[in-house]
UniProtKB/Swiss-Prot annotation:
Name by which UniProt lists this protein: QWRF motif-containing protein 9
Domain of life according to the entry: Eukaryota
Taxonomic classification: Eukaryota, Viridiplantae, Streptophyta, Embryophyta, Tracheophyta
UniProt xrefs under Pfam families: QWRF
Renumbered residue ranges of the record's region Disordered: 1-89, 115-144, 184-293
Stretches that traverse the bilayer: none
Compositionally biased region (Basic and acidic residues): 79-89
Gene transcribed to yield this protein: QWRF9
Gene Ontology terms describing biological process: spindle assembly
Amino acid sequence: MTAATISPSFNANVKQNKPPSFPSESSNRRPKTRDVASRYLGGTSSFFHQSSPKRCQSPIVTRPVTPSSVATNRPQSTPRRESLDRREVSKAERMLLTSGRSLFASFQADSFTPGTLERRKTTSSATISKSGGGKQEKLKLSDQWPRSLQPSCLSSRSVDFTDTRKKLIGSGNGVARALQDSMVSNRPVSRERITSVDLETESVSSGSSNGRGKMLPARGNVVKARVSQDRLEPSSHGLRKISVDSSVLSPKEANSLSSPRGTSIARGLSPSREVVPPRGVSPSDRMSPLRVRSSLSKNTPLIPHFAVDGKEKIRDNGVADAHLLRLLHSRLLQWQFANARANAVISSQKMREERRLYNAWRSISNLYNSVSMKRIEMQHLKQNLKLISILNMQMGHLEEWLVIDRNYMGSLVGAAEALKGSTLCLPVDCGAMVNVQSVKDAICSAVDVMQAMASSICLLLPKVGKISSLAAELGRVNAKDEGMLDVCRDLLNTISALQVTECSLRTQVTQLQ
């Protein structure tokens, strides 16, 4: 906002001409006007005009008038809080307040003209000179918004009239009575009056008009605003409805009017904020609507044409920023989609490779197990071959032992049978009687058999000794063979070493040659 840098000192010298309020008044001089900064830009209350005590006062000004001998200029950043007393306001004044409030909300915009800013950057208090006593009075709007409490969106701002507790004095009550009579007689309030009141209280560049109530042209287009007020029932707690109709609009202005700022807005006051009609207003304080219209319309400022250009420039910048933001958001979504797809592909490839590695590890483990089993089988076969070779060497001796064993078994079986037969035939109990000759013959036969056995045993003893000697000789031969094998092993080692030496010597000889 380039217009916000205009110094307040220059704005304080700007004077606006106002016509005399009554021809019969003794003090009809042109009063000095002084403006304060707007609540929408500098964080201070909206401006107001100085006038004589008998002049019509704006219904928006709700601060009580406190006389003071010396007018002090207060800084803009230090708003004053004054004591307020509850006063009653008539229905016409409430309608006027609501209409001004709705016009503020409907004609608000994001850019303001330099003229309006110059008028809003002045001090927040002004001195009013009285015609009778020559005293000065300070007026200040009761509705001041701190900077921290301002809404973020200008289209959602609304003027708070909760502090309208001051009973309007002088000709202001006449204006309220005239507006009430015009509403009762079903006569619509003129556009000049409503527009001038709106400009007197807020002077918003996007919705302000000239002294005749016509909107200034924005790039060659004429905008006509028609404000219609509908008086609701008393039970609606002060609800008022204002609709703005446009006949010739540019595309951007049509979009701005089609937005919530330009459509018809119904606002209501809570029961605690409901205003009460004034009491004790005399008929002599009334004023004709024509004089109110003339006094209010001649103080409306003229707005330059480049305000709309600044507004459109800011709007274009906002549209460009929004478009850039959408492009960046779409690009971010594209990158997120690409990253998600890449992550999905990478995860699938990772799972596939892990599966392949697991299968390879499993096949390698199976091969290792099979190789180990083959090695075990090979060792078992080697042991079996060694055992077979040893048994083949001892098979001849085992066959000879089998023949000898058969002969011994036959002789032992014959001796056992003979002894059995001889013992069973002898009666030895129960008074047995034996034949001595037969017993003698039996004993003799047994002795003969034993002698035969002894002779056979004697024949076998040398054979057994011979076999034992052969076995001992076999052991000696085996031990000798083992010694010879050791010697052969040593000889083979020596031969291999000598062969290596011979090969090295031959290579050296070949190198020397």
